[in-house]
Structure formats: C-alpha cells, structure tokens
Amino acid sequence: MCSIIGYRGKNSAAPILVNGLQRMEYRGYDSVGIATKSKNQILLRKGIGKVVEVNNAVQLDELPGNIGIGLSLIHI
C-alpha cells in the first residue's frame, strides 16, 4: 500500500508535502520520500521509518522548489 501527495503552487512544496504525508500516516509506514523540482533539477530525499523520523534524519521539508511529490509506503 502507498500514499501519494502532490503540490504545485507559489509556496515551497516540501513543507506542504511533509505535512500531507504526516496527515495520512495513521496507517503506519515503513518508508517515505519527497521529490521537488528547483531550477530545472529534480531533487530527492528518502528514508526508512515514519515521516517525522525520516524528516529529522534527512530534512525532507528543506528541499527547495514549488513543485513536488511525496510518497509513503508500507511493505506488507
């Protein structure tokens, strides 16, 4: 199972994506990742654990860019 969230707008995408993934986390996840687009580059950060754990480890919410996608997975 997985949850996917996307954002495109004027604000920084990463904090919005992290917040959205946290709101869907009640299911319990094994891994999470975020990709954003900034200056014609796609930037990716990911890790194993709950959203807050991965965010603390790799600073998901600090990725630059105002377009992005977030994904969380539970491995069954």
Where are these regions (language model features)?
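Extreme N-terminus nucleophile/cap motif
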Residues: 1-49
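Structured interaction and signal-relay segments at domain junctions
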Residues: 40-66
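Conserved small/polar residues in nucleotide/adenosyl-binding loops
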Residues: 74-76
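C-terminal active-site-proximal or functional interface alpha/beta core segments in diverse enzymes
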Residues: 69
